[in-house]
Swiss-Prot record:
Name of the protein in question: Surfeit locus protein 4
Organism listed in the record: Danio rerio (Zebrafish)
Biological classification of the source: Eukaryota, Metazoa, Chordata, Craniata, Vertebrata
Keyword terms of this UniProt record: Endoplasmic reticulum, Golgi apparatus, Membrane, Protein transport, Transmembrane, Transmembrane helix, Transport
Residues annotated as signal peptide: none
Domain-level remarks: The di-lysine motif confers endoplasmic reticulum localization for type I membrane proteins.
Listed GO MF terms: cargo receptor activity
Transmembrane segments: 64-84, 92-112, 179-199, 203-223, 242-262
Family: Belongs to the SURF4 family.
Subcellular location: Endoplasmic reticulum membrane; Endoplasmic reticulum-Golgi intermediate compartment membrane; Golgi apparatus membrane
Topology term for the membrane: Multi-pass membrane protein
Record motif Di-lysine motif, residues: 266-269
GO biological process: endoplasmic reticulum to Golgi vesicle-mediated transport; Golgi organization; lipid homeostasis; lipoprotein transport; regulation of lipid transport
């Protein structure tokens, strides 16, 4: 079987998967995407005093402001997740979750940690894709804004979301000299570049979903670590952040790459 035959067979398999799951895939994608916000909101409830004390000690902002921070995070994240899953006011929910990401980036000094900053940006990319999906279902927020043909804001959101998802992958690269790590990096980098430029997008994104899912379950198995150990919370954070990016990739699979992509441009050639 030649290379083209293998690629064609893989694309047929991906199309068959999409046909079988097309009714459920967007729901699964949204649930995965908001999972990190849902987990963090629930954690805010159960670790109320610890989170408040941490913010008060770090920023010396006093009891009241620290409590306000926890309340905003709790209500903003749980409320945003409920709106997204119920498909009500999704655009406002996305903007609220964007604000939560920005607030946490500053409050937890993520700006100075490149790895966590890239993951937060990738999470923002997933929200951009969710925003694009909500625009395809409901009324445009940009009604009255002059349109440039096919280059609508939705398509640029899809492009921005795809590019930001690349950042999550970059944090997973292993700079080891063994053959498996080098092969893993090369194949993964090729796939994420295909997703970013929008070439063979659905197949590349679906392959990345399977790959990230395997890595997530293997490396971030927080359920195997006792809850009292700090590593438990660290692995749980990693697990749900990666799950959210998987949700973003599933949205790419469900929606396609959008107009600003090589897949769409090929149709014009």
């Amino acid at each position: 079987m030649g290379q083209e035959d293998m690629m064609s067979a893989a694309e047929d398999l991906a199309d068959q998967f999409l046909r079988v799951t097309k009714q459920y895939l967007p729901h699964m994608a949204r649930l995965c995407l908001i999972s990190t916000f849902l987990e963090d909101g629930i954690r805010m409830w159960f670790q109320w005093s610890e989170q408040r004390d941490y913010i008060e000690a770090t920023w010396s902002c006093g009891y009241f402001l620290a409590t306000c921070f926890v309340i905003i995070n709790l209500i903003g994240q749980i409320g945003g997740c409920v709106l997204v899953l119920s498909r009500n006011l999704v655009q406002y929910a996305c903007f609220g979750l964007f604000c939560i990401i920005a607030l946490q980036t500053v409050a937890y000094s993520i700006l100075w940690d490149l790895k966590f900053l890239m993951r937060n940006l990738a999470l923002g990319g997933g929200l951009l894709l969710l925003l694009a999906e909500s625009r395809s279902e409901g009324k445009s927020m940009f009604a009255g804004v002059p349109s440039m043909g096919e280059s609508s804001p939705k398509q640029y959101m899809q492009l921005g979301g795809r590019v930001l998802l690349v950042l999550m992958f970059m944090t997973l690269l292993h700079f080891d000299s063994d053959f498996f790590s080098i092969l893993q990096n090369m194949v993964g980098t090729a796939l994420i570049i295909l997703v970013a430029v929008g070439f063979k997008t659905k197949l590349a994104a679906l392959t990345l979903v399977v790959w990230l899912l395997a890595i997530n379950v293997y490396f971030n198995a927080f359920w195997t670590v006792p809850a009292y150990k700090p590593m438990h919370d660290f692995l749980k954070y990693d697990f749900f952040q990666t799950t959210s990016v998987i949700g973003g990739l599933l949205l790419v699979v469900a929606l396609g790459p959008g107009g600003v992509s090589m897949d769409e441009k090929k149709k014009e050639w």
